[in-house]
């Protein structure tokens, strides 16, 4: 940045979020908050917002960005699968169906906090058992909400996305960039 501004502190362990922000030219410092992600009895969209807020509030710094992504299948949260078998079950349930992906972010600047939730509609094509086995065997879905990564091998599972693709990846990049830019925090 060259202006002596502090780095953007990313309150997330997601390598995807870090890579997206670095691709825009932001210097990033990762500070993974020790926030429990299980057990909050909230609807999916509210859960994403609550988790993003908790993560952001748990980290110190002038410029902090936290985010959380929740996969919503008919009002049920599909988190990160515990193991390959649960990943297989998730993909069977998503096969040929529409689901929602909610990504919430919490942006703290020296003057304010901005919180938003963005939602994309994701349509999976019908998947064969062989395709599911192939994807599960890759291991890609084990660390991702819903058990798939739209930006990796999981792109083969999708029929279409309505809304911001990067919401599905884990951060509505254009919106976050616009908010940072408008507040003078530029790459």
Curated annotation (Swiss-Prot):
UniProt-listed Enzyme Commission number(s): 3.6.1.9
User: Which keywords does UniProt give here?
Assistant: Cytoplasm, Hydrolase, Nucleotide metabolism
Keyword Cell cycle carried by entry: no
What does the UniProt entry say about where the protein is found? Cytoplasm
Q: Record's Gene Ontology CC terms?
A: cytoplasm
Q: Does the keyword ATP-binding belong to this entry?
A: no
Where along the chain is the active site annotated?
Answer: 68
Write down the position(s) of the site called Important for substrate specificity: 16, 69, 151
EC main class here is hydrolase
- Please name the CDD domains in this protein's record: Maf
Provide one Gene Ontology biological process annotation: nucleotide metabolic process
Q: Name one GO molecular function term.
A: dTTP diphosphatase activity
The protein's required cofactors: a divalent metal cation
Q: Which reaction does it catalyse?
A: dTTP + H2O = dTMP + diphosphate + H(+); UTP + H2O = UMP + diphosphate + H(+)
Q: Which Pfam families match?
A: Maf
**Where does the UniProt entry say this protein principally localizes?**
cytoplasm
The cross-references to NCBIfam families, in alphabetical order and at most eight, read: maf
Assigned protein family:
Belongs to the Maf family. YhdE subfamily.
Task: Relate the protein's function as given in its record.
Answer: Nucleoside triphosphate pyrophosphatase that hydrolyzes dTTP and UTP. May have a dual role in cell division arrest and in preventing the incorporation of modified nucleotides into cellular nucleic acids.
- Name assigned to this protein: dTTP/UTP pyrophosphatase
The scientific name of the source species is Thermus thermophilus (strain ATCC 27634 / DSM 579 / HB8)
Mind giving the lineage of the organism this protein is from?
Answer: Bacteria, Thermotogati, Deinococcota, Deinococci, Thermales
